[in-house]
Regions:
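Predominantly extracellular beta-rich ligand-binding scaffolds that present long acidic/polar faces
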Residues: 1-201
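Extracellular modular ligand-binding repeats in secreted and cell-surface proteins
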Residues: 199-222
Length: 222
């Protein structure tokens, strides 16, 4: 889905040209997503695919979570654990998922924007990710695939992923250990548990719970 403005004319509600010029026309819009949790797989074939919202041109997203899911973008760009593309604010959210896409793939957002239609830019702050990116042609990161927009106090756990497009940034996108992640007082329970699932012919053969950093013995593989 998207958080944006529908520009199609509504003849019943839209202000028409008959309104006198002595009246000042002013519009206000509000759009908030709060405490939304997604545990289901998301698949798209075009640009703007996200665990919570695909394209976010406006509004405010906070305290959301994607957990134990796969987010795939077959042919398009801008794939994110929380938002595919944001031109607004993404704050205080958690992402634990597997992602794939063509360009601009990020654990929190695929990319932000420098300047939106109303002159403002995106802000991505105080988010945490523990993700795996299995396929990306260009521009990937545990937080974002692009450094466009404002990034503040975002943190990620990864042995191989950069924070934002091949780099980590102090104060913007910093790596932390899993032990440090566990010290967060508001850490969702889903960030503390892991399940290994074996699938054959689209059927689950075996599922096993394990701790972060555990190794799997060959005898455990069906």
């Amino acid at each position: 889905g998207s958080m944006t403005i529908e520009y199609t004319l509504d003849p019943e509600d839209d202000v028409t040209g008959h309104l006198s010029n002595i009246y000042r026309k002013q519009y206000e819009y509000r759009s908030i997503i709060q405490k939304c949790v997604n545990t289901g797989d998301v698949a798209g074939k075009r640009s703007y695919v996200g665990g919570i919202v695909g394209r976010m041109d406006l509004g405010y997203l906070t305290a959301c979570e994607t957990s134990s899911c796969t987010i795939t973008n077959e042919n398009g760009s801008y794939t994110g654990g929380i938002a595919g593309l944001t031109g607004a604010t993404v704050h205080g959210s958690f992402s634990k998922c597997t992602l794939s896409g063509k360009k601009y793939v990020g654990g929190i957002v695929g990319s932000g924007v420098q300047e939106n239609v109303d002159g403002s830019g995106s802000t991505v702050s105080w988010n945490y990710s523990l993700v795996d990116i299995t396929d990306c042609q260009q521009y990937q990161g545990a937080i974002s695939g692009s450094d466009t927009g404002t990034f503040e106090h975002n943190y990620y756990v990864s042995d191989d992923l950069p924070g934002i497009n091949r780099q980590g940034y102090t104060g913007r996108a910093e790596p932390i250990s899993y032990a440090e992640l566990l010290t967060l007082p508001d850490l969702p329970e889903s960030m503390k548990s892991f399940t290994l699932t074996f699938v054959a012919d689209d059927k689950t053969v075996l599922s096993r719970a394990f701790n972060y950093g555990d190794s799997i013995d060959e005898s455990d593989i069906p």
